[in-house]
Amino acid sequence: MKHWYDLITEAQSVEKIEEIRISLFGKKGVLAAEFARMKEASDEEKSKIAQELNIHKTTLMNELVQRKITLQTQELQEHMKSEAIDVTMFSSSSESGALHPVMQTMDRIVEYFSSMNFTVKTGTMVEDDFNNFEALNLPKYHPARDMQDTFYFKDEMLLRTHTSPVQIRTMMSSKPPIRMIAPGAVFRRDYDITHTPMFHQVEGLLVDKEGAVSFANLKFILEDFLKYMFGDVEVRFRPSFFPFTEPSAEVDISCVFCKGSGCRVCSKTGWLEVLGCGIVDPNVFEAVKYQNVSGYAFGLGVERFAMLIHQIGDLRSLFEGDIKLLEQFR
């Protein structure tokens, strides 16, 4: 057996060790043949031969394992050495990530209102009917609910259709004055060139004592905000309807594409609708058990702002993961 011990010691690769193992321990290997030859020996010799073979069997296996470990360690060290990196050398620049244009726009919106002392509030995306509708002056079977195609679960749970429930929960857990915005994802059953089933909103709320908040306050901050976002644009307020505000208004800016002269994007009107706002309806304050207060609220679609800022024609392109498109907004 000395020959096999020498072969193991001299082996220079893991593959060679495997060949030796098969030659020794295979079904037709050396040890199997030696054990088979025992049949020809006497009973006394069989015992002695079996003892010697078992000792060799154990010792050879241990030698194989140890030599294999040694060779594997050597191979690993050589491999690591061949792949060593000189950290002092100049390297080619690697691709770095960047914020999605929707998140860039969201951050810019939050930055403005944070500078105006609005706190940022977040909430759950799965809401109940009360916080999403009833507390906002939208009782069951109210026709205005048809304005929002809702994803429903069981037990009157739903995916929120706006971030207004965050305002309701904030008012129910806090006392005025309140000065907050609620950015986040919302969900509606729409999918076309200007709508997606999931999009982002930022809604704002300011509540103070009765008579302390006026439409003039709302108008001032929204005009300042829109000039911050779009530069030197004209702003106009149009009367509108929202169940949770009274009076209500839609806010338009002069078209950022044609500068108000009229184009296909603005339907030749020279104006683009960008957000809705109004004075909080007394029924909303009643739902959260507020008394002797006044306030204003507003809401905007972040994707809408991103499309106007970056002049993107199709809302759906923001969610398709097109690297060529997204790389333009680094």
From Swiss-Prot:
Q: What class of enzyme is it?
A: ligase
SUPFAM superfamilies this protein is in?
A: Class II aaRS and biotin synthetases (SSF55681), tRNA-binding arm (SSF46589)
Kindly list the cofactors needed.
Mg(2+)
Tell me where it mainly resides. Answer: cytoplasm
- UniProt EC number: 6.1.1.20
Gene Ontology BP annotations: phenylalanyl-tRNA aminoacylation
Subcellular location per UniProt equals: Cytoplasm
Give me the residues that bind Mg(2+), please. Answer: 246
Q: What is this protein called?
A: Phenylalanine--tRNA ligase alpha subunit
Q: Which organism is it from?
A: Sulfurimonas denitrificans (strain ATCC 33889 / DSM 1251)
